[in-house]
């Protein structure tokens, strides 16, 4: 044996380093040393010497879960395993290497490791993460799922416990890629004290506490934006310091409970509490670092560190412990944690004095303990070497000292035939500080036999440990004996708080079994017939070996050679094999007991499997029924674990297995069949769920088998109970016998006799039933149904009908109310109780009523619940309907009353006007009777379209053509018509416009009367007379009294105290306008048309143009093609008549009249310029300023009116017209359909005006605010009219005539009665302005001359009488203010403004316009001028939006004349009878009644003149004058729907020179209306004979009792 070589010392450290790496897997709180770099050399076995098991460093790398253990003795397998592990292809880590840098010893620091899943279609489950060294720690991360292309993070904690560079690896156990490694490193350094000396660092241990609960203080959450979180930390104490603390103060639950109050500022407190809690846990890390007693103190301390990585502020307010002992001392100061840091902050420290720990409970435990606290394994074999040695040749025994804890005696039994020398005993470096070798003095000579070689003592006391290590012995034979040990802490049997340390030997042979040792185990996973063979063989070997260990003798021999053989005393209790085996069940002896479960329901319970070894373990879990030979296996388990075979069900399939953390909610393929395959890394734990689905009622017991390669077989018991839900209601079971009876005594129904029928009291019977849960399962009744209806039905109702739960053997009362309807004496219904498990319990509700009392009680049964609501709704809607009828009736009555009041007002205005007017020159009554009667005989009377103040005298029964189309509601009362001449014209003008122009003129007239205008202005009407008017020639000695018949609007005088008088003097009676040759087509029926003499003499002085009033008309400052002009600028003046709102634009008329007055201001010296060509007129016209001429002229006119002698216009006041005054119908204006209001002004003005003319005699009464509407319609095709803008007159060639575009309306002054009579009929005579004529008050009449002839006073001497031949003529009176200034298209139905118009806008107040004078139209009316000049009736050119107040004229100065038609009643004349071949681009041209015989007729317009409404057609049309009105709402857009189309009057209106002279001339000019085809979508025709029927019956009947016609008497 000489020459025995001793192995190199490095080989010992090599093996110790390998064991050290294994210890790091368990994360025990033991100081772990870095695997020594100097221990690089492996054990070099000597030749012919036993080779010990050598632990290579690469062998510490763990295999994947898919592979079983690699043979530790096969280098090729080890190398392939290492390559597979370090591939790292499964996950990508960031950063690639984690370096913590320099950290102080004992001070933890944390960093985040990010793991990315690069797979696009699969997810990765991270089962666990652990470190190989004790310096690095990872909080538990069970079942962390990394989605595809997703990432997760781990917090790695570095706690250095020794100086120098520390490098290690993290192992990430994944489900898809196995175990992946990751490199981590750090450097530990000591803290240097102020004296410069290094402190001695005591041993430090790392603990991760468990956060038990987090509670939120609601009071704090409501008052502030912060939340107070109560965090309870539960920590299992597994080190020496905690063990000492535990002995001081802990109870039997083995935990140290701490409560920490934290104030956290939440960014979004509105989140759910769970979200806030999870957010806090994700960013808050709490660790404990326990230290041993230091050199300066005997106290052990536990330091608490907190790391906060979030952004919110955390204030640690308080920390408390729940210890009942006084030995624990807590040091804490409130601290504000920094945010987003990596270093931990120390917040508290716990200390416990050793003196307290040595006394008390520890001593009590020792006194009550009768068995050794340390138990030794009996045998440990030496690993096989090269020599064929029996493993039993060398045996090591561990003797436990009964009275000493943590001390073992190691015995060596030498079976060799020679002696062995033990040279040295050493431990691995990792366990040097935990274990100490005692009683080994040096090399020992050991002959064959049993020898006590040394003692092993556990250096740490009262700590919970779980240690795997080896004790190495070197010998003189070159062999190194390795004694494998497992030392762990276990609770004492007495259940005390102390732990006992157990040392096992020899189990390493089975733990970490390689494929070479178990070649068939992996093949047995298929669960075929070989499975039982493999399991039984391995189990028998393990069991027999344990028996040898248990029954082996222990020899005691001292080292001096004395030999003593003695048997070791047997322990009082035979140790079982179960206690010997390391169990895979975390709780040995656990029985999963499933409570009562309903059929077809599933209940899941979980248990935990744990790998107690330092090597990976493969598990196969399956129910007993799936094992190939369950009976044989149960018999084996009975021997091992003492299982009761009688209670085991071998075939039940009611138990299945599932993972506690399933992958995406699904199980693996094996789990579907109840089989699970798990791979556990060292110390790894997993939860496994057992699903119990009872198939039948009753109890069932079975086993869950755990096949593994560590202990071969393990098991856990399961027990379940299948039960059913069962209810009783009223003591009866559900089904046929479950009848619940309602007892209704007869005395109860006798109350029906005492109840009144009106009381309608509900008779009901209530009964309570007890619902009992007689089954083992808790029942939740989700709903109660009566014949399928929830809670009530068929008279039954369950009170407090809501969901309730019943535990087993509990009950609850329900109340059911029955309300009979007394239709049947026997009522049977079903009551169903539906549970949350969809079980339905059916019972029968049975009610019997006395049959003879049913009729008596049926009377007191109330009606349905909705009956009262139905009647209330009915009454409500009927009341609403009645209220609506009342409102409509009230509105109609108010409308009638307002109409009546307006009529009275107009009568008062008429009377006042007639009283204020002086004597006037009127045509004799004989002329009226002869002429008007002939006219009426031809056409008959009509009450439609009459002017205002003319009462209807006849029903419209004699209407011929379209009478059938009119409303059947035609008034049948007698309508007495006044004598008024009628002016047949298509267009009408608005008195509102006229009044507005008057108001503006009053302010703007600053120019003197004598101021001259350029020639272009004077020639404006020259062409107008040639093209559009038949000039009426007056005798040279025309009487100036003619001026007296022309008056100005009353409201013009209002601005001058309502007494201003203005007289316009005609400078030359011989003024004339040339008339082109051609036949004049009048707007009169053919019977009244007279061919005009073509050789009519011209006026000698000037062409007749409308004479301007005393107030100058304002200029038009507007562009001519601006349809939007009227809407915003024109004030609205609305008056309602017959339900029609009339709106009057006034500003345009103001502008038109202003321009007319400009024309009038031209001196007589410039009259000859009118005879120049049209081209000159056009060119010169645009440059005429106007504003500067206004004020002087106005003042002059006002002065004339004040000083002048007004003649009393002695008009023939007939009785009929007086009656018209009494009517006083309020004027209603029609909405304009043209944007430009052509105001027709007369050049004639009476020299004297009565100073007391009532304001009410004007078109617009200030008292009633009645407004006459002007037509705003202008043909868009007027090129000349488009050149009028900014106060200038632009006159194109041959287009000087003022154009009056038809608004297609027939507002001819029809009375309100006739309008109502014809409302609603297509053939009606009413329109939207059906009462224009009716609503206009009495106004003085005016006459007009063409704008080019500003006739002075010298033209018509005051004494010269004028005789007009009005045989077939219709008066065409036009107000001065009703001539539009410009022509521009406008939207129809423009709104009108209020009567009070602002004067600064150039608008006349509505009451300041003069009404138009009436012109008599009779069958043989002659008006002879003094000089014999014939006066030819001239067709007035269509005036755009012009207004002529005929009715006002009749009631005013022409009181005895019939109310004339007004220009805004032009629509009364059919366009079929008008020829509108000429546009009116010259707004200054004003129509006149005096037309020179030589002036060209406008009916023969030159071909170069564009037609406003179409081409001029001279066709012989029927003698129809369709003075129709329409109530159609579209009349505001297109005018009357009976607007005339293309018919033309071919007759002229000649003047009969033999007409007798009237002393008081009413109409100085009669205008023949030129026809312009208008827009009429319906082409309606109206026979004029409807006006003449009455006149035919009565020869003395006035001209036309219809107000649309005016005749002179």
From Swiss-Prot:
GO terms for cellular component: cytoplasm; endoplasmic reticulum; plasma membrane. The modification Phosphoserine is found at residue 1122. The gene is TMEM131L. The chain crosses the membrane at residues 870-890. Residues 991-1000, 1304-1331 have a biased composition (Low complexity). Residues 1-40 form the signal peptide. The keyword Endoplasmic reticulum applies. Glycans are attached at residues 343, 439, 522, 593, 709, 846. It comes from the Eukaryota. Coiled coil: none annotated. Residues 952-961 have a biased composition (Polar residues). GO terms for biological process: negative regulation of canonical Wnt signaling pathway; negative regulation of immature T cell proliferation in thymus; Wnt signaling pathway. Residues 41-869 are extracellular. It holds the Pfam family Ig_TMEM131L_3. Belongs to the TMEM131 family. It comes from Homo sapiens (Human). Its main location: membrane. It is found in: Cell membrane; Cytoplasm. This is Transmembrane protein 131-like. Residues 891-1609 are cytoplasmic. Expressed in thymocytes.
